């Protein structure tokens, strides 16, 4: 199992190109099942989760051609199976996203219950209730969700009783081929859902209310292929900005957008960063200053994203002052606290809130990654620690960060992958 060896260094400085969004590319890849022609996707990140989704689509029979590192061409017309097997689904929760497209296009879907990060209970009951409201019959058998329809799915008015990104994506993809009008209330509003909706529109779907909490879909009989470029990764963008701020550095990130990261940028400015932006770039400069502690509370978009919480905890660990970080989305997403405390961080837990008292520097220690974003917080902590930090179980990082060691090295950091 690979590990990272990180030597604490000075401020991060330089320029980076941000990759395409993992959390947009995964549902977009699943959505290609809906098309009747080839779909050419650009700016697809080279990540383990993307490879898993491609392997899943190939298992279903889709023909996939990869051109270079970031272009994927999908021909969905060769599909010959409607079963997403446990062997693939167990490694990545986003596998559930083939459920809606398979059911809508082919009338049948057999999908194993999903896996992925161990960050709490993320039930799929809203996905299933929404599909049943569209006329699907669903049973759970042997660890599989088995969904069927007679005739086309039927448009419906469905209120999601909690905001769910995956549920919104699955029901949106099912609704585009349903008969009649579907209204999805309390829909998630994340930029990645906007990106998925824009792809579906490019394929011929009729969707209004994109970017709002009410999506209205007029079902069509078929969708075509198209060319589409995946949006930039806002969490990767935020991670490198936070790392630069924690290290008192100066960076410029290209092929990204400030408009998808407003809540994070506000907190970085609170921490003392000078942030300037352009149409496709963000620059951050700490002017050599120690960051100031910033308190935050995670909530659905457009509020502060749960996927950036752990990175800010690493920043607050070396910030001037005391901060409160409250996690409201996932119940187990403060797991990085124990590892950060091994490095000398002063953190106390009160229910779902971490109280962080900043120290001048952390101290290197062997630590273990537990999920994707907690892993990123440990990398940031290693960069602002005295000595060499060894991070185990970095396969979590490889699920969501493209070439992370090379990118940090380009900013002057000492991050080495050690093959086991």
From Swiss-Prot:
Binding-site residues for phosphoenolpyruvate, renumbered to this chain: 22-23
Catalytic residue positions: 117 (proton donor)
Functional pathway: Cell wall biogenesis; peptidoglycan biosynthesis
Molecular functions (GO terms): UDP-N-acetylglucosamine 1-carboxyvinyltransferase activity
SUPFAM superfamilies, per the entry: EPT/RTPC-like
Subcellular location: Cytoplasm
Function: Cell wall formation. Adds enolpyruvyl to UDP-N-acetylglucosamine.
NCBIfam families xref list: murA, PRK09369.1
Protein name: UDP-N-acetylglucosamine 1-carboxyvinyltransferase
Organism annotation: Cellvibrio japonicus (strain Ueda107) (Pseudomonas fluorescens subsp. cellulosa)
Lineage, opening ranks: Bacteria, Pseudomonadati, Pseudomonadota, Gammaproteobacteria, Cellvibrionales
Recorded name of the encoding gene: murA
